[in-house]
């Protein structure tokens, strides 16, 4: 079994390293630094290539049995489309803003199985929702999730576990919720509230546009929301930058040069938010599902708390996200899920065997979702 992993960032490297224990894996990236990290620590094959050149994919991917799409979000949709056009099965973790289900007909036509949003949230949150949706009548679904540094450094008290550009996109995109059966659009970062967690103390939750596919696949659930978790105070800093125009996309003239404020801000925040090797962090997620089963009220909660792995020097967000992606990839590899088309995880969770497989795959790697 030959697997191609497109993208060798923090999560992409974790995906390639884990899969290489059982399969012949090749990692593709245009950044030689990322590839060098893999070369030094694994036996993963590494090839430098510009993955925005989709015209080369047919030749590039012809010998591979499965593709993992781990490129940054801004190039994810077109990359997935190119992979599907090559007729290759794919697990996608690029978290692009476009609607992946728009590619369903193409995937069916090309006889491709494509599982998208294969991470933590979206990803595992969707899988869990899909599983319980098959067992009970759900009235409300709430997901709170965040990846944070253990060491709090002012002013932002934050390190980006993935591309800072994707974080800024998350902070600026309006949030879609479902309230009383209707989709409601709220400003990003709105409705902040403080919540206490056993492992980390008080965190602040904020609206973000994380429901994604379940807005369309779970329309029968009357109340659904997803919120991002940060240390208290972080949100007010971001809101101040936003209100002052630092995230504006229209060009302004500075000393005779036209620049976009968001580009300058991104460059500055990239350095501020860059996680250094060895920086300890954690991932936390809480899922609350309320409804009825056999006409009896039922509440279900899941809690994920995972920390940086000191032994393997693997960030928690890379572990929780990358291993989830690999669990879904193995569903395809082992033919446990072989339907053709584009499928977000909630459409896979309704199969109990698939649900158990993914949960056990993660548990075997020390990532455990505790149910109460």
Where are these regions (language model features)?
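Helix N-cap at the beta1-alpha1 junction of Rossmann-like dinucleotide-binding domains, i.e.
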Residues: 32-34, 97
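C-terminal catalytic/substrate-binding lobe primarily of soluble NAD(P)-dependent oxidoreductases
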Residues: 134-372
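ADP-ribose/adenylate-binding Rossmann-like module
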Residues: 82-100
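Conserved N-terminal Rossmann-fold NAD(P)-binding element of oxidoreductases
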Residues: 3-7
């Amino acid at each position: 079994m030959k697997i191609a992993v497109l993208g060798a960032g923090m999560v992409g490297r974790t995906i390639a390293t884990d899969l290489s224990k059982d399969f012949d894996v090749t990692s593709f990236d245009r950044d030689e630094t990322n590839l060098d990290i893999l070369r030094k620590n694994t036996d993963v094959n590494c090839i430098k290539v510009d993955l925005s050149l989709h015209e080369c994919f047919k030749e590039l991917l012809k010998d591979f049995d499965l593709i993992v799409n781990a490129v940054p979000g801004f190039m994810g949709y077109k990359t997935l489309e190119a992979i599907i056009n090559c007729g290759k099965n794919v697990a996608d973790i690029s978290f692009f803003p476009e609607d992946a289900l728009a590619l369903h007909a193409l995937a069916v036509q090309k006889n491709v199985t494509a599982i998208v949003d294969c991470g933590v949230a979206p990803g595992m949150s969707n899988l869990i929702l899909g599983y319980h949706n098959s067992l009970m009548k759900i009235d409300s679904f709430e997901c709170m999730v965040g990846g944070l540094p253990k060491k709090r450094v002012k002013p932002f008290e934050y390190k980006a576990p993935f591309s800072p550009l994707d974080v800024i996109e998350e902070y600026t995109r309006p949030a879609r919720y479902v309230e009383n059966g209707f989709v409601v659009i709220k400003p990003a970062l709105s409705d902040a509230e403080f919540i206490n967690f056993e492992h980390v103390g008080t965190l602040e939750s904020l609206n973000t546009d994380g429901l994604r596919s379940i807005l369309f696949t779970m329309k029968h659930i009357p109340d659904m929301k997803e919120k991002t978790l940060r240390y208290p105070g972080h949100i007010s800093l971001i809101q101040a930058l936003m209100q002052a125009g630092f995230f504006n996309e229209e060009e302004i003239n500075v000393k005779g040069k036209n620049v976009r404020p968001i580009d300058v801000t991104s460059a500055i925040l990239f350095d501020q938010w860059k996680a250094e090797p060895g920086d300890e962090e954690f991932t936390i997620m809480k899922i609350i599902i309320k409804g009825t089963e056999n006409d009896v009220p039922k509440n279900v909660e899941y809690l994920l708390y995972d920390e940086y792995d000191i032994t393997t020097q693997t960030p928690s967000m890379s572990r929780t996200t990358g291993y989830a992606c690999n669990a879904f990839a193995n569903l395809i590899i082992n033919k446990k899920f072989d339907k053709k088309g584009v499928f977000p995880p909630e459409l896979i969770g309704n199969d109990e065997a698939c649900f158990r497989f993914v949960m056990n795959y993660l548990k075997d790697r020390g990532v455990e979702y505790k149910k109460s």
